[in-house]
Amino acid sequence: MSDRIAQVTRNTLETKISVSLNLDGAGKGVFNTGVPFLEHMMDQIARHGMIDLDVTCDGDTHIDDHHSVEDIGITIGQAIAKAVGDKKGIRRYGHAYVPLDEALSRVVIDFSGRPGLVMDIPFTQKRIGQFDTELFWEFFQGFVNHAGVTLHVDNLRGHNAHHQIETVFKAFGRALRMALEKDPRMEGIMPSTKGSL
């Protein structure tokens, strides 16, 4: 298997971001973003997706976390698209249900080349610590637009907002892992009857 690794740098007047990842890693996460709760969530992506993920961000968090969170999602999406390459041999689709105590979430992903986000998380709180829960939409929208995936995210139940979003990110990591696994029966084959994605 050829290395499925990528490094992407994205610099704007609002953020300076670097992402390095290995899709066939050991689930190691290294983060320095100035947004601690997002780092906790990205660690779930790395561990449950078995992706080595290194993210640094110097953003305008003195204003708020919006630009950093959205731009990190964009840059991770770009890096995954780069690492996946032509998509030949991958399973393409992934899904996962993950519980955490009273919370349960489902994530379904398709590496279709068609960006689309359907997300329903009825948060029980507007903030988790200092983190604005509305920003998770910005993270996933940025990711979807630049990874070129269709993503359905549903929190099916939960009373604790931290549990709600943690189950989402764990399920997201596991769905990514499933979709990006190489299928030995599909070696060199595009997972689409169209012949392209």
UniProtKB/Swiss-Prot annotation:
The keyword Lyase applies. InterPro entries: IGPD_sf (IPR038494), ImidazoleglycerolP_deHydtase (IPR000807), ImidazoleglycerP_deHydtase_CS (IPR020565), Ribosomal_Su5_D2-typ_SF (IPR020568). Pathway: Amino-acid biosynthesis; L-histidine biosynthesis; L-histidine from 5-phospho-alpha-D-ribose 1-diphosphate: step 6/9. Its main location: cytoplasm. GO terms for cellular component: cytoplasm. GO terms for biological process: L-histidine biosynthetic process. PROSITE patterns: IGP_DEHYDRATASE_1, IGP_DEHYDRATASE_2. It catalyses: D-erythro-1-(imidazol-4-yl)glycerol 3-phosphate = 3-(imidazol-4-yl)-2-oxopropyl phosphate + H2O. One of its GO terms (molecular function) is imidazoleglycerol-phosphate dehydratase activity. Belongs to the imidazoleglycerol-phosphate dehydratase family. HAMAP family: HisB. This is Imidazoleglycerol-phosphate dehydratase. It comes from Cellvibrio japonicus (strain Ueda107).
